[in-house]
Regions:
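Short, acidic loop-to-helix structural element flanking the phosphoryl-transfer center
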Residues: 59-89, 95-104
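Short, glycine/charged-enriched secondary-structure capping and boundary segments
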Residues: 18-20, 102-105
Length: 118
């Protein structure tokens, strides 16, 4: 079986980290559990300039590497690979974030899983 897994907010807790960035950059304090929209610009009530700054900061290598793994994700994925399934990680992250995203996967014992930026 082929299994495709989204990176952000499936494999790792991306939105939770973005709440920290929004607070650091703009003093906007929206607790993670209160993020109501996939559109973070709307969730944090940001103007276009602020949203662009948030996205830029969130995709810096030093930030990407700090994202917490969704509990149990790597164990489940490795089990699927061990069972013979073809597993792929898919992300809408900008292509220039490929290397740190690949590093994050490798550091979380997902070296056998290909990564695709779409």
């Amino acid at each position: 079986m082929k299994i495709y897994i989204d990176f952000d907010d499936v494999l790792c807790e991306t939105a939770e980290y973005f709440t920290k960035i929004a607070k650091e950059l703009f003093g906007i304090d929206v607790p993670y559990r209160q993020v109501q929209f996939f559109n973070l610009q709307k969730s944090f009530d940001l103007n276009d300039e602020q949203y662009e700054a948030l996205m830029k900061a969130g995709h810096l290598a030093e930030n990407l590497l700090k994202y917490e793994e969704t509990p149990g994700a790597s164990e489940v994925i490795n089990k699927w690979v061990d069972q013979g399934h073809e597993v792929f990680i898919i992300t809408g992250r900008p292509f220039n974030s490929y290397e740190p995203s690949r590093q994050w996967l490798d550091e979380h014992h997902l070296e056998r899983v290909p990564l695709f930026c779409v």
